[in-house]
Amino acid sequence: MVQAWYMDDAPGDPRQPHRPDPGRPVGLEQLRRLGVLYWKLDADKYENDPELEKIRRERNYSWMDIITICKDKLPNYEEKIKMFYEEHLHLDDEIRYILDGSGYFDVRDKEDQWIRIFMEKGDMVTLPAGIYHRFTVDEKNYTKAMRLFVGEPVWTAYNRPADHFEARGQYVKFLAQTA
């Protein structure tokens, strides 16, 4: 099951959990109210998983590839890790399925506070278009993920501030309706 919590404000390595003591856990329902969708799947059978195929069909996730994020597999690793950790949004949903390893997606809540979502093997998440977010590997420095898209992939990230985009405006309206 997904683990998520409000992050502490401590400086330091973003690959650490940044879980405050005492913790402030976040449940699936709270993530859903932010538009974040979550599934737990069997990553060992991703190539022939009927549950994954059902999700892809229902949500029109027609394109996919696999990325391995580690120093010896990802060209310009340090540069890419910094880029992934910059707060940004996309004009389309971001869909990731962790096939191996682990990492963190951080998303902003309605009050602009960071919620950290721990992602490990078998976790699949959809972040809605317009949500400010970022990603980092954890201290293991290894994540293998399936990237899914509706139609042709669009890789463009818009660093904050990016409130002028229609996708952001639609997301803010969505948040107001879930209040």
Swiss-Prot record:
The keyword Ion transport does not apply. Fe(2+) binds at H88, H90, E94, H133. Its cofactor is Fe(2+); Ni(2+). It comes from the Eukaryota. Detected in heart, colon, lung, stomach, brain, spleen, liver, skeletal muscle and kidney. It is found in: Cytoplasm; Nucleus; Cell membrane. GO terms for cellular component: cytoplasm; cytosol; nucleus; plasma membrane. Pathway: Amino-acid biosynthesis; L-methionine biosynthesis via salvage pathway; L-methionine from S-methyl-5-thio-alpha-D-ribose 1-phosphate: step 5/6. It catalyses: 1,2-dihydroxy-5-(methylsulfanyl)pent-1-en-3-one + O2 = 4-methylsulfanyl-2-oxobutanoate + formate + 2 H(+); 1,2-dihydroxy-5-(methylsulfanyl)pent-1-en-3-one + O2 = 3-(methylsulfanyl)propanoate + CO + formate + 2 H(+). It holds the Pfam family ARD. One of its GO terms (biological process) is L-methionine salvage from methylthioadenosine. The keyword Signal does not apply. Its EC number is 1.13.11.54, 1.13.11.53. InterPro entries: ARD, ARD_euk, RmlC-like_jellyroll, RmlC_Cupin_sf. Residues 7-26 are annotated as: Disordered. It is a peripheral membrane protein. Binds either 1 Fe or Ni cation per monomer. Iron-binding promotes an acireductone dioxygenase reaction producing 2-keto-4-methylthiobutyrate, while nickel-binding promotes an acireductone dioxygenase reaction producing 3-(methylsulfanyl)propanoate. Catalyzes 2 different reactions between oxygen and the acireductone 1,2-dihydroxy-3-keto-5-methylthiopentene (DHK-MTPene) depending upon the metal bound in the active site. Fe-containing acireductone dioxygenase (Fe-ARD) produces formate and 2-keto-4-methylthiobutyrate (KMTB), the alpha-ketoacid precursor of methionine in the methionine recycle pathway. Ni-containing acireductone dioxygenase (Ni-ARD) produces methylthiopropionate, carbon monoxide and formate, and does not lie on the methionine recycle pathway. Also down-regulates cell migration mediated by MMP14. Belongs to the acireductone dioxygenase (ARD) family. Monomer. Interacts with MMP14. This is Acireductone dioxygenase. It comes from Homo sapiens.
